């Protein structure tokens, strides 16, 4: 961790519609395997005087031979803007949202096929019962 890490940003674009600045990040990390995204978020927040939670980094590729990685970064004007525009999976990654657990694919298919077997008056009665139970 004592090895120096250099962060350069290029192609910086201000995107007022999405309330963010977006740019390409070049990270020089000689004698080091890679730099964690969390560490990059901290350093970018420090450089651009923003909150760490308003910074998003992704899409990093390390060049052959190591020592240099290139990726993409976004800095939102506020954490609220980040929560509004960032994809849910990235918010989960950064700890800003909870992961939505859903039934497995097989369970969803089995339910769909079970529901297909009930039709006609039985189906109508089932919907009514479900509505009553919901109230």
UniProtKB/Swiss-Prot annotation:
Q: Which stretches of sequence are listed as region Disordered?
A: 102-135
Query: In the UniProt record, does the keyword Cytoplasm occur?
Result: yes
Does the record carry Aminoacyl-tRNA synthetase as a key word? no
Chief subcellular location: cytoplasm
Q: Subunit composition? A: Component of the small ribosomal subunit. Mature ribosomes consist of a small (40S) and a large (60S) subunit. The 40S subunit contains about 32 different proteins and 1 molecule of RNA (18S). The 60S subunit contains 45 different proteins and 3 molecules of RNA (25S, 5.8S and 5S).
State what this protein does: Component of the ribosome, a large ribonucleoprotein complex responsible for the synthesis of proteins in the cell. The small ribosomal subunit (SSU) binds messenger RNAs (mRNAs) and translates the encoded message by selecting cognate aminoacyl-transfer RNA (tRNA) molecules. The large subunit (LSU) contains the ribosomal catalytic site termed the peptidyl transferase center (PTC), which catalyzes the formation of peptide bonds, thereby polymerizing the amino acids delivered by tRNAs into a polypeptide chain.
Q: What is this protein called?
A: Small ribosomal subunit protein eS24
Q: Which gene encodes it?
A: RPS24
């Amino acid at each position: 961790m004592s090895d120096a890490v250099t962060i350069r940003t290029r192609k910086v674009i201000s995107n007022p519609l999405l309330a963010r600045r977006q740019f390409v990040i070049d990270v020089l990390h000689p004698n080091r395997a890679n730099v964690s995204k969390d560490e990059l978020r901290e350093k970018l927040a420090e450089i651009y005087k923003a909150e760490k939670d308003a910074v998003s980094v992704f899409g990093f590729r390390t060049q052959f031979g190591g020592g240099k990685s290139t990726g993409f970064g976004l800095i939102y004007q506020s954490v609220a803007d980040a929560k509004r525009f960032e994809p849910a999976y990235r918010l989960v990654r950064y700890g800003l949202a909870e992961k939505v657990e859903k039934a497995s694919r097989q369970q969803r298919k089995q339910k769909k096929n079970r529901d297909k077997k009930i039709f006609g008056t039985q189906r109508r009665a089932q919907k009514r019962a479900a509505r009553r139970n919901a109230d």
